[in-house]
Amino acid sequence: MEKVLIWFCGTGTTKQDFLANVEISGFSAIVAIDGIGTAAMLTKTQALAKRANWGGSFVDMSETLGVLYDQVNGYDDRAGVVTLDSLFPLVDYLKTLKEYQLVVGGHSRGAAVGLTEFLAELYHLAVQNQAPGVWANAKTIRLVVVDPVQGQQDADKDTNAFNAILKDKTLAQILAELETKWFGGREVFDTLVYSARYDARSSFAFDSRWYRFITEQMGKQAGPAKRAKLVMAGFRHSAPVSKEDEISALYQGKGVAPIAFLQQLVSFDPNWEQSARLLSQIENGYLDQLAAGAKTDLISQLDKQTSLLSTALPALSAANRCKKRCRRITRKNRNTAGSTAISTGRRRFNASYQVTSD
């Protein structure tokens, strides 16, 4: 069966960056959409329309300033239109397929905004009683939602302001109603939320819409949310998609690593749950050592590369934070699926839900 991938890149990440870091194979079609805060996206949004405010028009006089402005402020309506317009050529291709497996994934703002807006647009069409068209031929739609950090988009805490995303509809409701209206109740959506295990930056918290999905809907509400899973790997926000942030030395000879794990999730590898548990064992072991003050080369590298200093912010080492918090990360249901409370150094999920990594 043909496999098709749609990927929404994170802030400052081009489709070339993504494909260079995460090797994707086995797909008949791949559409990777440039992230906000890239020259590629800026060129497309400028061609569509000028910014609505004077300050935005001023920064667009320089590509460098325009890119930086977008990295700080995130998606605007123009970027939303460009993102969705990028999918039209794919729709023409899907018309040629009788059946296919679809993966829709994204990282950071690409997950929090791009992927979410895509789902909301499908929902918007469904509630207007429009036919599903080519989407009806999807046997499975796997959502791979990687660290959906929204970055305080325009001072908002979530994605409610974006096109077709209704304030009174949760993600669980959107997915459930799509399955009912477009797929006759068939279990189509397979949702995997992939969180970085740790990031020292408090501003890199989950988008509140996805946070509520994890803590209030996942494993509890009927439909796709009941089947959804949370997995965790990596010690930096971009570890699942960036070789630079993966800290690959930690995983050398282990048979698993955050990027390779993402490849498994995207490619429908049936062994992904085994890899999730192994990553949990490996990373929780490092956190135990870090909390205990171990002085090995690997622990020193982990401490250095997870400190705020490594992100060009005032220094606050992961060791100092972990001495207070790592014990809570590692002591409960660390290797098996089940009900747990997870503290990650930047955010905490206090709820009962199914996880496969801790």
UniProtKB/Swiss-Prot annotation:
GO terms for cellular component: extracellular region. GO terms for biological process: lipid catabolic process. It is an enzyme of class 3 (hydrolase). Keywords: Hydrolase, Lipid degradation, Lipid metabolism, Secreted. It is found in: Secreted. Its main location: secreted. The keyword Hydrolase applies. This is Extracellular phospholipase C. It comes from Dickeya chrysanthemi. The gene is plcA.
